[in-house]
Regions:
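Single conserved hydrophobic/aromatic residue that forms the stacking wall/gate
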Residues: 1-13
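Glycine-rich flexible loops
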Residues: 10-166
């Protein structure tokens, strides 16, 4: 069973319209967070989120309250964040929203690490990135894709792992 822990400082980091913060230390996420260039525009997945991606420099163990303000300032209005040399963070207006954001950020990091192993990267041209950014804004104005995707993910989980929630 997994325990959902309430982050005691999430309200200091997030604006009042956000309901969920997710933070991970996955191998691919930490690997990209350790790269000076950060997330590269080399995949469709990355191109979907680059305009809403923020960075926060590593300050050591997050035990000091004064980092909260800097983290909030760096996050701004973004919903994706790479914590340099540390991991990934996403925020959302709901759990499904933050989860789907983390899914795409993590997938983007996995793709980048795999592509770098092959070498000779082919970045998405800026003109294409601009078009993707405009399309994402139009889609987001129509509502949250996460609210449609979440029930499907739960149905899949029910099929693959019945009883996970008991």
């Amino acid at each position: 069973a997994y325990e959902i822990k309430e982050c005691d400082w999430s309200s200091d980091v997030c604006s009042s319209d956000l309901a969920c913060v997710l933070h991970t230390h996955t191998r691919a996420g930490v690997a990209v967070s350790a790269q000076k260039e950060g997330l590269l525009p080399i995949s469709q997945q990355a191109s979907l989120l680059l305009d809403s991606l923020a960075y926060h420099d590593y300050e050591g163990l997050a035990v000091y309250d004064d980092e909260r303000g800097r983290l909030r300032a760096d996050l701004g209005d973004h919903k994706y964040m790479i914590l340099r040399n540390h991991g990934l963070l996403t925020v959302g207006r709901s759990i499904p929203d933050a989860f789907l954001s983390m899914y795409f950020l993590e997938m983007s990091c996995q793709i980048q690490i795999s592509a770098q192993a092959g070498g000779n990267l082919n970045p998405v041209p800026q003109k294409v990135l601009d078009g993707v950014s405009a399309a994402v804004k139009v889609q987001e104005s129509k509502g949250s894709a996460a609210e449609l995707t979440w029930p499907a993910l739960l149905r899949r989980l029910d099929r693959l792992n019945p009883g996970y929630d008991s």
